[in-house]
């Protein structure tokens, strides 16, 4: 039986960004199953691929089988969380990045369901006495659009034997400058560190050097190509909701290293996690791909971490 599902996010594809693309993937997968799917978003470019878009908060007063809020601490989501007690339709609040802000804590209290994907999510519910409202909603990627093609090294002139990659934008939490410092101090032989981002509003894009190549890239195809051709993907962020790029790395059979947070901590069996710059430096200097782990990581994504698994979990809430 068809369900009416409303997703809530601050900005929606085709704008670039992790949240924008992740909610698009969830919405389109939900639509493909014969449901009536809308998205409430502060910034969008109109209906997309059959998904209906709106910026009118009055849509919250309509009858929905489920309202799915993608995280908090941003304007549109916070408006829904703040008013969640007054909204008649059931709300699934996907924590994404656990927050102790007043509006997010209100969302924990007032929303009917709380979606968790990481160890940190479940621990946050336990600390706030709402563990019983938690439901598993696995982060996942769309396998139809997550496969990289060869060609990045040739296109961008990468001549070294090895290439380490980190993507996601030049935001303070991504710690790109700090990663460059660790890489330079490690003196990894015959290796280029490639950084990609689509936003440098803070002016913190690192300087280019012989073995460090920071790029401004809007093309998802180029980013996936970089991930596919990388010997190692590095997620050096101080904070992340999950880190979907780790799943993209695993799907493209690329090893990853990540600070022990969010998705990296949750999936530590499939990559290398660290808690200090020294641990990362030592790993880079001695890096050798583990073919067995690469295959296990790929198998895990294909069986447990695709967008169809995410939507399975969401729809299970109201089945």
PLM feature spans:
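Glycosyltransferase donor-sugar binding loop
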Residues: 42-45, 167-170, 192-204
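Acidic anion/phosphate-binding donor-loop and adjacent secondary structure
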Residues: 103, 140-155, 204
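Nucleotide-activated donor-binding/catalytic signature segment of Leloir-type glycosyltransferases, i.e.
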Residues: 203-221
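Short alpha-helical donor nucleotide-sugar binding micro-motif in glycosyltransferases
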Residues: 219, 225-230
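Aromatic "clamp/platform" in nucleotide-sugar-dependent glycosyltransferases that forms part
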Residues: 238
């Amino acid at each position: 039986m068809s369900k009416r599902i409303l997703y809530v996010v601050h900005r929606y594809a085709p704008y670039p960004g992790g949240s924008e693309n992740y909610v698009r993937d969830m919405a389109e997968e939900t639509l493909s199953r014969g449901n009536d799917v809308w998205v409430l978003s502060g910034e969008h470019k109109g209906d997309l691929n059959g998904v209906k878009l709106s910026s009118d908060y009055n849509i919250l007063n309509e009858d929905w089988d489920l309202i799915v809020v993608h995280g908090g601490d941003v304007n549109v989501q916070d408006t829904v969380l703040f008013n969640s007690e007054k909204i008649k339709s059931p709300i699934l609040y996907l924590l994404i990045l656990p927050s102790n802000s007043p509006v997010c804590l209100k969302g924990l209290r007032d929303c009917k369901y709380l979606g968790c994907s990481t160890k940190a999510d479940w621990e946050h519910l336990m600390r706030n006495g709402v563990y019983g409202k938690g439901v598993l909603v696995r982060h996942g990627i769309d396998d139809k659009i997550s496969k990289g093609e060869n060609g990045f090294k040739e296109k961008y002139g990468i001549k070294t034997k090895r290439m380490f990659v980190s993507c996601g934008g030049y935001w303070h939490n991504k710690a790109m400058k700090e990663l460059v410092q660790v890489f330079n101090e490690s003196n990894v032989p015959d290796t280029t560190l490639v950084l990609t981002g689509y936003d440098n509003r803070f002016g913190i894009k690192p300087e280019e050097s012989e073995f460090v190549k920071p790029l401004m890239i809007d093309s998802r195809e180029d980013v996936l190509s970089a991930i596919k051709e990388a010997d190692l993907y590095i997620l050096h962020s101080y904070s992340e909701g999950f880190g979907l790029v780790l799943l993209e790395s695993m799907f493209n059979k690329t090893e990853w290293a990540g600070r022990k947070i969010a998705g990296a901590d949750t999936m530590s069996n499939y990559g290398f996690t660290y808690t200090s710059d020294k641990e990362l430096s030592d790993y880079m200097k001695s890096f050798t791909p583990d073919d067995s782990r690469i295959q296990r990581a790929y198998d895990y994504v294909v069986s447990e971490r695709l967008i169809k698994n995410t939507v399975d979990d969401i729809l299970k809430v109201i089945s």
